[in-house]
């Protein structure tokens, strides 16, 4: 068998017969988050067009993950949206990548926080979700259709919406929004602070996502630290190990260890 035949045999595919012809279905390609440990656990990144929930208490590690996700998109010239109530995490990106980075600030004091610009949308708050949907639709229509598969968005307002609108209304809004984002070619990370909500509220929201990533606090040899784990990722391969996020040196060692794991360290849900 030739090398070309070997390579073709190894390609993951779903085949069916249509008018005597075999069709090959492409698997979901990964979109790198830019956060090395997370990309390693995900075996490359988040599958394109997936919606993933990031549950985390307020911490530097969560902020860094969000920042890397946004920076990676902007630096790669990929359409990148950031929906937030406090824009300091990515203010420089809005200024430096005005053609591909779009900021949506849901804050009544937004105009005092950030100068107006064509790529910055300032809304009164999270109370009127219709206004946010209109702003997202307006910005999406400005994007290059050829970049549909590499678009990314971070929704950093879920906990605010959930506390303001309640589980029923938030779930209804998210069902519509996530469907629209997927059809528009966006890969989504939605940030939720689990400490602010009841288990019932969390379940009502988390069940809408195809994947779930969790950052928790726990003890390390050096004291309290943060740990990252992929809780689920629908029908995708990922490492089930929990990674420690405390200290750059420890992160480097953890990343090296994860990359050296053999196949028993992987989990596939089918």
Features from the language model and the residues they span:
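C-terminal regions of RecA-like/P-loop NTPase motor modules
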Residues: 2-26, 236-270
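Glycine-rich P-loop/Walker A and Walker A-like loops and their local beta1-loop-alpha1 context
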Residues: 30-87
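Loop/turn-to-beta-strand initiation segments
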Residues: 79, 149-152, 183-191
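Short beta-alpha junction loops
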Residues: 86-89, 185-187, 191-197
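Nucleotide-state-sensitive switch-loop elements of NTP-binding domains
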Residues: 86-130
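Phosphate-binding/switch loop-helix module in NTP-utilizing enzymes
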Residues: 112-182
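Phosphate-binding/switch region of NTP-binding enzymes
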Residues: 192-260
């Amino acid at each position: 068998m030739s090398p070309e035949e070997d390579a073709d045999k190894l390609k993951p595919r779903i085949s069916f017969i249509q008018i005597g012809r075999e069709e090959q279905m492409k698997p979901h390609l990964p979109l790198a988050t830019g956060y090395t440990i997370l990309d390693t656990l995900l075996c490359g990144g988040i599958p394109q067009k997936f919606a993933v929930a990031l549950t985390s208490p307020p911490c530097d590690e969560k902020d860094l993950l969000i920042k890397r996700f946004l920076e990676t998109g902007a630096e790669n010239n990929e359409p990148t949206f950031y929906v937030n109530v406090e824009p300091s995490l990515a203010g420089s990106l809005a200024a430096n990548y005005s053609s591909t980075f779009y900021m949506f600030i849901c804050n009544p004091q937004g105009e005092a926080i950030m100068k107006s610009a064509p790529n910055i949308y300032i809304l009164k708050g999270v109370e009127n979700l219709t206004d946010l949907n209109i702003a997202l639709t307006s910005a999406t229509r400005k994007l290059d259709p050829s970049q549909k598969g590499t678009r990314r968005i971070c929704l950093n307002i879920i906990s605010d919406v959930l506390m303001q609108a309640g589980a029923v209304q938030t779930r209804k809004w998210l069902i519509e929004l996530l469907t629209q984002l997927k059809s528009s070619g966006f890969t989504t990370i939605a940030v939720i602070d689990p400490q602010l909500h009841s288990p019932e509220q969390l379940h009502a929201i988390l069940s809408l996502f195809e994947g779930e990533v969790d950052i928790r606090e726990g003890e390390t040899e050096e004291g309290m630290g943060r740990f990252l784990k992929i809780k689920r990722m629908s029908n995708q391969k990922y490492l089930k190990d929990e990674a420690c996020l405390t200290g750059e040196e420890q992160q480097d060692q953890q990343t090296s260890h994860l990359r050296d794991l053999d196949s028993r360290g992987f989990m596939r849900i089918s």
